[in-house]
């Protein structure tokens, strides 16, 4: 007998973190969205070169749901982050100065039976 799944083959039980997504909508216009059902993982890979140790950082963000709340160029902060209201705040809001802040480089929607079930973003 053929068994047909009615649910996505992915368990979203680990999507229990909060992230804040920031986007520059236009000159001087910034949006902030808090997502409470997310999986956010930092990855650090070290490679040894002839001149010393070289490190590379990356991240994976999984957001379940039927919408795509993040796009390339957005900034994502682990936890509930502060408001960013001015150009000066936005310019200072960079990964080198804010621990846990990353910039999205790619967004990949994932589908199950023709419907969006989650997105994976990273950089």
Where is each model-derived feature located?
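N-terminal disorder-to-order initiation segments that are Gly/Lys/Arg-biased
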Residues: 1-62, 98-99, 106-123
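Short, acidic/charged, Gly/Pro-enriched secondary-structure junctions
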Residues: 67-105
